[in-house]
Amino acid sequence: WAEQFWGNGFSKEDYDKVRAAIKDPDNRWIKFINRVLDETNPHVAKMAALNLGFEAFFRGTKMIRKNREIYHCNIPWLILFDPTSACNMHCQGCWSGTYGHKANLSFDDMDKIITEGKELGVYLYMMTGGEPLVRKADILRLAEKHNDVELSIYTNSTLIDEDFCKEVVRLGNITFQLSIEGTPETNDARRGDGHYAAVMKAMDLLKKYGIIFGTSICY
């Protein structure tokens, strides 16, 4: 059905590779997808499939290609923005720290970015900072208002708690990339004592609630 829907959006070789992967029970990507489905909250999994699989990958990409021809310019598949430059940590070598900690996008500004992005076919939004979760209330509002997009948050993990996880599960369209560097000693030398343990605690919480997350590693 994907080939019928997508047509010549991909090459015959691409479709053949996907078919081969689906038929191979030992394919690492199929194993990864199955593990995600097994360990993810059902509502979160459904929203990821709808927002990333259908809205972003299928419908969104077709809109993007059409709008590139209309406007004669490149349109990205995802948009990255910083809700705030504020942060509750002072990590050594942080590039964003050189810009100060007082810059903020208003809720209306962020709402406009997503609203106009969707009109062009963009349904995936990444947030960095600063620490985006300093603005967690506004992020939850955005996720609820735009429940057809996926929000991916790059975070130092320290502001993830039980109440926040419950809201993320209720909404279903927020995923996380947790910043961490190697061993506890290596990580805490750069980010401060106790940060590695805080990331492990956040991972345990996210896994407990079946929320999708990954890691962001500097090396």
Whereabouts are the PLM-identified features?
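A short N-terminal interaction module
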Residues: 1-37
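Residues that cap or initiate secondary-structure elements
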Residues: 87-89, 100, 133, 159, ...
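Canonical Radical SAM [4Fe-4S] cluster-binding loop centered on the CxxxCxxC motif
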Residues: 72-74, 78-108
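Radical SAM/AdoMet-radical enzyme domain recognition
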Residues: 107-127, 135-219
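A broad, low-specificity signal for short, low-complexity segments enriched in glycine/proline
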Residues: 38-45, 53-55, 87-88, 113, ...
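Long, contiguous hydrophobic alpha-helical segments, chiefly transmembrane helices and signal peptides
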Residues: 49-53, 79-84, 93-95, 133, ...
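N-terminal [4Fe-4S]-dependent radical SAM core
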Residues: 27-80
